Amino acid sequence: ERKIMPVQDIKEAELVLVGIGGEMQVKLQSLKNIPNFSEKFSVLQEEQSRQWVIPFLIRYYLKQEFHPEIAGAYKKLKEILEGKNYFIVSLSSDDLIRNIGFQQERITLPCGGYEMMQCAENCREKLFQVDEELWNKVCGWIEDSISLEELKEPKCPDCGAALVMNQYGEPAYYEGGYL
């Protein structure tokens, strides 16, 4: 029988280590229930050369307002941990926990997420921030203010290979940025 630790025990603890499993991750199927997501996702799936945009589309819809149940659970956790010395290790790669107000240096996502990119070939074992100009253009396409043709796939500045989201499912996943 599994014993759940009462909130009072957490409040009395000097240090709290929180482990969050992949079950808390926003599922692709739930995103497909959002009308505009489904339409854009279908367009991208039809064109092989545009599939690199799919992770950006997913990132756009990983906002609290689209996932109130998961966001609510994280907000409750934040209340419980208020004023505590804590550290969170989350196997979820949806980055939703990063937008709740936790101290960023107290969160690690060893399976990656949607905030950093890496070379698809992992040529230099380094991470890159998602380019703000590219992100704004992708948002423009999602919001129907620019065309899909205006989006250019990001490339590694070192070797010219594609830049991909730094996530566990990538063939050359680089975990160094999260350790």
Task: Give the positions of each predicted feature.
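Conserved catalytic alpha/beta core of Sir2/sirtuin-type deacylases, generalized to analogous enzyme cores
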Residues: 1-179
